[in-house]
Regions:
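Structure-specific DNA junction-binding interface
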Residues: 1-78
Length: 78
């Protein structure tokens, strides 16, 4: 997932990934921590695409990115 996040950053798509990285860095997270958090937001989308053959849900991904560093969608797993 980290490679996917890095590719999204390189492509600046979706733009929310770059915005989230900058926001997390400005609030004291290291780059590695920020990438890990972004990957946590990406994980549910990748699971739905790979395991459930669903379309990538950009709206939900963006909503999860906006909630970082909180990860309520992970429940007790975080």
């Amino acid at each position: 997932l980290f490679e996917v996040v890095e590719n999204q950053l390189a492509d600046n798509y979706p733009k929310q990934v770059t915005e989230t990285l900058m926001r997390l860095r400005m609030t004291g997270h290291s780059r590695d921590e920020a990438i890990e958090l972004i990957a946590c937001a990406l994980a549910p989308e990748m699971i739905d695409v790979i395991e459930h053959q669903q379309s990538f849900n950009l709206e939900r991904y963006a909503a999860h990115l906006a909630q970082l560093p909180e990860t309520p969608w992970l429940g007790d797993e975080a």
